[in-house]
């Protein structure tokens, strides 16, 4: 199952898994795009695709997806997530709450539903899409915090699941060429070109590291350098560096 498959990394994972011969369950709120993607994957790769319309900001829809996961899947990609623009103190509170419902609550609830049948089968993979923003402090207070939670959650589960045949991984990409920033209303003008990653490369690197049983996965040499350096220098210096890199790109 892949959540948020109708654009960006979600589409990248869906296409890769379809090409690799997997049957898919795709959950997203945009029904038209969801059905169009399902048809494309069937025509291009012969994949059997089950569509599950759901808005993960809504409790009833999260429960519907969790019920489907409880019947068993081999792989869960918790990809759905979003950011918002502007400052925390002026942002609409309901938008902030919806962000946490999707970025945190849905990840926890869907993983909780998926693990029991995986453990019973003795095999399974959960990929939680986090972000470099969860490893490095930045302007995005609630977004960064939500992704830091995903990383800590994934690492804790991975430790607890050792030896079971079930793996949990946190994918931490940097800036990826997707609709993410445009949808959030975040101005990315002036972002250095070397910081941008391609969807196909991120998916490829992620699955390669999953096969190596890496838990925290950071695609791209540039981001490996940034995150490794961020762990070695004082936090106040890291904050100063991220202010320079992300200047003018307000995110909440």
Residue spans for each PLM region:
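Conserved glycine-rich Rossmann-like NAD(P)H-binding loop of the short-chain dehydrogenase/reductase
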Residues: 21-37
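Conserved NAD(P)H cofactor-binding loop of Rossmann-fold oxidoreductase domains
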Residues: 79-84
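Substrate-binding pocket helix/loop in short-chain dehydrogenase/reductase
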Residues: 87-98
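Active-site helix of classical SDR
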Residues: 111, 146
């Amino acid at each position: 199952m892949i959540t948020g498959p109708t654009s960006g990394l979600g589409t990248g994972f869906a296409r890769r898994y379809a090409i690799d011969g997997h049957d898919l369950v795709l959950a997203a709120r945009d029904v038209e795009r969801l059905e169009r993607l399902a048809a494309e994957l069937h025509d291009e790769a012969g994949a059997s695709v089950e569509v599950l319309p759901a808005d993960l900001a809504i409790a009833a829809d999260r429960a519907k997806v969790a019920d489907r996961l409880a019947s068993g899947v081999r792989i869960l990609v918790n990809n759905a997530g979003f950011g918002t623009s502007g400052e925390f103190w002026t942002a609409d509170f309901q938008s902030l709450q919806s962000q946490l419902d999707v970025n945190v609550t849905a990840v926890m609830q869907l993983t909780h539903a998926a693990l029991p049948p995986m453990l019973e089968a003795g095999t399974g993979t959960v990929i939680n899409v986090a972000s470099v923003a969860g490893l490095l402090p930045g302007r995005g207070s609630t977004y960064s915090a939500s992704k830091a939670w995903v990383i800590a959650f994934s690492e804790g589960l991975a430790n607890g699941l050792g030896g079971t045949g079930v793996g949990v991984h946190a994918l931490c990409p940097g800036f990826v060429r997707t609709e993410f920033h445009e949808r959030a209303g975040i101005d990315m003008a002036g972002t250095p070109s070397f910081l941008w990653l391609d969807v196909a490369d991120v998916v490829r690197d992620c699955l390669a590291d999953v096969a190596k049983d890496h838990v925290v996965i950071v695609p791209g040499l540039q981001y490996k350098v940034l995150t490794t350096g961020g762990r070695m220098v004082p936090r106040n210096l890291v904050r100063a560096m991220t202010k320079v890199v992300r200047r003018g790109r307000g995110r909440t």
